[in-house]
């Protein structure tokens, strides 16, 4: 079915749908009875958006694990915060899974420290430890922060799979009993609720990312890097200072967008539809939050690449971190001069979306 007055976006332009199909040798999809109504009145659209959201959110989580390990390598942190015994003391699957993922990623790294080797059998006479005994939460509490996000994404996957294998039509025809059941299987509350939870989870992931960026860029906090990872002339060049403004404002936007749609409902249709799910709105807002998160994470990976070059620790990284560093440097070379970075951010986003670690 393709009416002559229907329009579609094709290659970034609004075009006549029939013309686009003809030019590409495609035939219009022929819908059967009730299929069109199901697409517009059921949960199909919101569920489809939700599944795409889930795919990109899961990839974000894996990248956040990678970034968190690389941050701890840069900071030369103690590795016991990701220890199996420590994280199994909390009976949450997500926390344990994140810690296990971090241990796998950090394997072979010469950057992280073992507390038993550094502190247990040595006499320390200094009154103030130069190296923090317990790093900042954004470095040390990663399993506890990303763990609930892992659990939520697992739950979202279960809900979405249940939904796409469900009948969201109304009424439901049962040929076995020869009954027609009038109900509300079109209602999208499951998807709306799950997309709200997903966007809250991704916002928290983005907040962690932003705090790690702040650690990376704040020389008085990290104590080992120049301000804003500036590899140029201090006082003359800016490093990634301007990019931090983008990361901070984008994270703030995510926080505002995290207000749930699930609890918003405006009656319509002569009050027949007196309480609705707003599920498509929820899914679209979650999509925006995810896109924002990729932008913030892109800036973090740019900063980490600069930091690794400044510290000259390429050969001490874990094999996984070294591979990511080299892949990034293949399209984002080290820089010292002040130039616009929006193209590099876009390239980094494209890399993060295409690669799967």
PLM feature segments, named:
Residues 1:
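Basic, glycine-rich
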Residues 4-357:
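C-terminal auxiliary extensions adjacent to catalytic cores
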